[in-house]
């Protein structure tokens, strides 16, 4: 992503600017209640687009979480693009989580796909098949393939994903975001050594989801 060292993600600048401008105008007009309301809105937008630095674990076989959130699904599932049974881990991001997404493993982007769809609540498993989504297929230097999918939700209707096919990505690198709450699905080889359980909280770029064989 372009906003590597800024405290606020660049994608949030327009929202912060608009909310801040409205706040200033209302304050100058002495509309105190509305000015106070939009000040709160401005602070929330800044909070939502915060861009914290993360320390990624050193183990190259470790798969790190692509998102801040909570594990809401863990189990075998068929991944349609690789057409095989894989270990699926779904992470739910609320509006209060950091929404910048990070690369789970170092490797090359061998495929990228976009599927238009609905905007169901992402905690509903139907969202896997019916919601708008954007996915990357990554291949590590050892030839291991995995898939990470950004799923749009009831409120989050804007997926941002920068990598293109052929790009080389580093584990923990920022690669996109989903605006205002959603879900990330990670598909790993079935023989991955899991390090998370249902209900666990995750930190993007830091929490180890599993160890590749």
UniProtKB/Swiss-Prot annotation:
* Localization terms from the record: Cell membrane
**Keywords, ordered alphabetically:** Cell membrane, Decarboxylase, Lipid biosynthesis, Lipid metabolism, Lyase, Membrane, Phospholipid biosynthesis, Phospholipid metabolism, Pyruvate, Zymogen
| Membrane topology type | Peripheral membrane protein
- Site feature Cleavage (non-hydrolytic), where: 181-182
Q: Does the keyword ATP-binding apply?
A: no
One GO cellular component from the entry? plasma membrane
* Top-level EC class as recorded in UniProt: lyase
Q: Name one GO biological process term.
A: phosphatidylethanolamine biosynthetic process
Which InterPro entries does the annotation name?
A: PS_Dcarbxylase, PSD-A
Pathways per UniProt: Phospholipid metabolism; phosphatidylethanolamine biosynthesis; phosphatidylethanolamine from CDP-diacylglycerol: step 2/2
Catalytic activity line of the entry: a 1,2-diacyl-sn-glycero-3-phospho-L-serine + H(+) = a 1,2-diacyl-sn-glycero-3-phosphoethanolamine + CO2
Q: How is it modified after translation?
A: Is synthesized initially as an inactive proenzyme. Formation of the active enzyme involves a self-maturation process in which the active site pyruvoyl group is generated from an internal serine residue via an autocatalytic post-translational modification. Two non-identical subunits are generated from the proenzyme in this reaction, and the pyruvate is formed at the N-terminus of the alpha chain, which is derived from the carboxyl end of the proenzyme.
Cofactor info, note text: Binds 1 pyruvoyl group covalently per subunit.
Domain of life of the native organism: Bacteria
The prosthetic group or cofactor this protein requires is:
pyruvate
Enzyme Commission code(s) on record: 4.1.1.65
Catalytic residue positions? 182
Listed GO molecular functions?
Answer: phosphatidylserine decarboxylase activity
Entry annotated with the keyword Membrane: yes
Residues with Pyruvic acid (Ser) modification: 182
Q: What is annotated about its quaternary structure and interactions?
A: Heterodimer of a large membrane-associated beta subunit and a small pyruvoyl-containing alpha subunit.
Please give the function described in this protein's UniProt entry: Catalyzes the formation of phosphatidylethanolamine (PtdEtn) from phosphatidylserine (PtdSer).
Record family assignment: Belongs to the phosphatidylserine decarboxylase family. PSD-A subfamily.
Task: Output this protein's name.
Answer: Phosphatidylserine decarboxylase proenzyme
Species of origin: Geotalea uraniireducens (strain Rf4)
Gene name of this polypeptide: psd
